[in-house]
Amino acid sequence: MLNLLLLLLLLALPAAPAWATGASAGAGPLAQRLDSWPQWQLPAPLPRPGRRDLEYPAWFAGQWQVNALDPEGVEPALHYVVRFRQNSRGAVVGDRAFNAAAVGRAVLGDALLAVQNDPANPNRQIARLSGDQQLESTVVGRRSASPNARTFLADELALQVLHGPGDPRVSRVETLSRYRQLGPNRIEAEQWQASYSSPAEGLAAAARRSWRGQLLLERLS
């Protein structure tokens, strides 16, 4: 379960009912990346985000009930609330700490104590876990695209460090998300994720584990 939390903490939200994969998802590097899943490798075609957050289409703004499913049936369905709001520049961004805490508590319950944003960097969050553990997650690569007015794709690579008793454990997690607006109050999505070894073992790496998820978002406000 902790590994699933590592995958989910970097997300603004999880995934939904599938539609056709492949180049039809949109032109460019993200479509090519999707075509190659699950045989992903690093380095990925993801520019460094600096200190800018991932910006979403305006139709994401608000609070949403999420129903997240594992199409393989390995993990139980998750139900939680996420929210997106305007930042100081007027762009719609995910409330990362709120959303990560919602996902984490749905997975781990009381084992997740708190999630905090780094006030100096919107791409860095710190989660406090039971057992004197702390998970630090920093987005180090990102690319997004809108093939049309109702579709949005985003790919993020996060560096994750789990601090606790013993030596820190370092890994990299990549999440490619594809969202489609079904109407003003519904969004469906699909996500593809892969985890990689620590950069200390080499910047180039093949995916060690892969996962795909589906989700449906229904507007609350």
Please describe what each predicted stretch is:
Residues 1, 69, 184:
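Residue-level marker of positions within ordered structural domains that often coincide
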Residues 3-14:
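Bacterial N-terminal signal peptides
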Residues 17-109, 197-221:
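Amphipathic/hydrophobic helical signal segments and adjacent flexible N-terminal regions
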Residues 43-49, 134-137, 170-172:
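Short amphipathic alpha-helical surface micro-motifs
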Residues 68-72, 129-131, 160-163, 193-195:
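Short acidic, glycine-rich loop/turn motifs
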Residues 85-161:
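Predominantly extracellular/secreted and cell-surface proteins with exposed
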Residues 137-221:
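Glycine-rich, aromatic-bearing surface loops/beta-hairpins
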